[in-house]
């Protein structure tokens, strides 16, 4: 039964039938084409014939008579035991709609797809003979076996020719292609179906497919009398299924996101390897999808067809070497969105039955699109305000932004899952074009696809535009038009393009135009592949719009989020501790151990009277020691759970600082031990070659193509470079400071023994366990500890300065990054006292001059990495102390002198 093309919805209990003065359910002859217009944002409403007209009077009489007969026959059903809420059964509603629509078509002389040839011919003959029988006795025969599902050409007024094979298939099936709105009928099993219950498992609510070896049972079931309407109707539940798709959001926390194993299931089916249950539980414990193959599934005994379907779907988007061949295959089987007539191709070794069996094996609930409302929920404003990791990271990153997580292994898996989903959608559209009666509402991916498109749009556009969105993106109507061949996707894409350009940033306009052109190309070239590409672009644009909105909200709300960042984190962890969801015992034991070690080592100024500032200093030292490469820690304390990734990156920066200082120490040793230089020459060489220049040149040598620093593998290159720099600066000084003469091409004069010594020394001292490395690392840690303690100004009651919250502001140039902590910053925002970085007393050389003395051997203040590490540690340690400092002091008890508090 064709669903009436009106958006008024099905007849409700309070309004069982339209009145004679307002027959809005019957379309007029002038609007029989029912075209979508890209310039209109809403669908056209039906034109109602006047009661005074002959057609209108006949329709009114027919409707009244039909309703009267239905009421007399008592063939009605009530809801909630109320006798007033009357809904006609399927047979009555079928007869009522068919009579009304055929009478209008008879008067207009136009044959619509909902009429049969016999009915239209009889109606025309009766009308021309002037037979004005009573409307109550009017019986228009409707031959449901010869229902036409051809494409109607709106320009010529004729139906387009269709394949005889398709006509024979549709004539044999004798079923509708889509169920009525808000209800569905089990096509293959017309037995009574009770309403689904929320307590039943999903498999129980899904229609059971009959075995392929018993076609006589299906024919016998189709010949049964209609009976009561409740035996044929099943009301859909309005409850939305939860989406188990992978979230596509990544922020600076580098938080691990869970993913489902649908891709691995497909691979296991393809390779015929069962998934080990232990691994499945361990890796995919959050997955709630049912497996593809069930014990009661008719395909479980012979999965060959399903494997071939999966292989074909993956092959379409697989190797780049077969892209040209795949395009030819897809184009040969493509569809025209105006004609919806798919051509069969001899290139396919996959039969239509294999495709149908693959669709029937779809698990329930049906998978959602890769970009769905559940995955985008994380970036809603309410979720942003409740996200503790984001509230923590925003302190360190002023330009914190959401972006799609397509990096690394998770990104590759996400792309593979998306390709599988869209290939399945492409397969469904192809099958439904050949066999529309195969469509099942609860097993089609098209239903959640259109629902997700509408739901995501409703979260983006203003509330006043919601009725328009619901009207245009009517899922059931769009699917019905898609199955009948009347859905013009180019018009729908044009409407979406106008809507996107109106609400998204202008920089997204080229992307929107690309999406619209994809649909136009699909219609022009009859390409199903381009149609799927256009649908993918639609969802990608929706995701980008949601991300833009979320990033704008974060940027606007950042000052407010920073103002109560400490209080929010305090409340968050106190709530977890009170509910016993977080156990701090191990963390408290860790701090107590560090406290005892510092007291035993004599690192406390007055062990007999330890104050709260002393405890704060121990906290600084304990956290900094977690960054040591000599004593690598595998786990961090629970209070530092939000800073795991940040601490790992800080440890890499610490190693880079120490290795640069090792190279600087080697450079000064080579200069000091060179007998060919006098004192003035040595001072000139050391003064000219600054630590910053040394760092830039060495980093360019040791960095590989992936951006990783390889110190131990490039010791020979570093040794040659340092010897070459010393030789060049020596000749430059001898030539009265002329760089041009020193850099003239000359024969190499490097000493091989010096290069060998430098290489051997670097290979040993760049190892974290070497003594020189340990001395330099401790020196860096001591400088960081003193700088943080002096700036914090910890009071006697343990309060520290709260300026760390606003340390990273864009107006100071302190722009953070989500992937690296080594960023260029403004040195004026964090000023380090020169006394903290004074030259080492154990230096092998004693340079003269104020500039050389202020730089010295351990002049780490010239390194941007040191400034970056200092800022991050200053904010991290003070935030940690503000939240967990009271717990540490309470745990120490009488060990701390609390006088004056």
From Swiss-Prot:
UniProt-annotated stretches for the region Disordered: 1-87, 106-139, 162-231
Keyword Phosphoprotein: yes
Keyword Nucleus on entry: yes
Biased composition (Polar residues): 74-87, 106-115, 220-231
Subcellular location(s) of the protein: Nucleus
A Pfam family assignment: Tcp11
Low complexity bias (residue ranges): 10-51, 116-138
Major localization listed first in the record, in broad terms: nucleus
Database matches in InterPro entries: Tcp11
GO CC terms in record: nucleus
Purpose of the protein: High copy suppressor of a cyclic AMP-dependent protein kinase mutant.
Entry similarity comment: Belongs to the TCP11 family.
PANTHER family reported in the protein's UniProt record: LD23868P, TESTIS-SPECIFIC PROTEIN PBS13 T-COMPLEX 11
Protein name: Protein SOK1
Record organism: Saccharomyces cerevisiae (strain ATCC 204508 / S288c)
Gene of this entry: SOK1
